Curated annotation (Swiss-Prot):
Keyword Plastid listed: yes
One biological process term in Gene Ontology: translation
Protein's UniProt name: Small ribosomal subunit protein bS18c
Bilayer-spanning residue ranges: none
Length: 75
């Protein structure tokens, strides 16, 4: 049972080689934002903590430049 659990966690990397996290790469950033505009969790994104920090900064910068929408706070 422990072995199958370990194998189920192996996944393809969320960011392919040659792709860089940048605030100008909107198509990449949209993959890590929910429909409501929220940044998805690191567990959902399958990113390392360093990649998640860079991604968060890039998404926030894209929001400031109006490339991505801010999250909708209404229910």
């Amino acid at each position: 049972m422990n072995r199958s659990k370990k194998n189920s966690r192996k996944r393809l990397p969320a960011i392919r080689s040659g792709e860089f996290i940048d605030y100008r790469n909107i198509s990449l950033l949209r993959r890590f934002v929910s429909e409501q505009g929220r940044i998805l969790s690191r567990r959902t994104n399958r990113l390392t903590s360093k990649q998640q920090r860079v991604l968060t900064a890039a998404i926030k910068q894209a929001r400031i430049l109006a490339s991505l929408p801010f999250p909708n706070s209404e229910n």
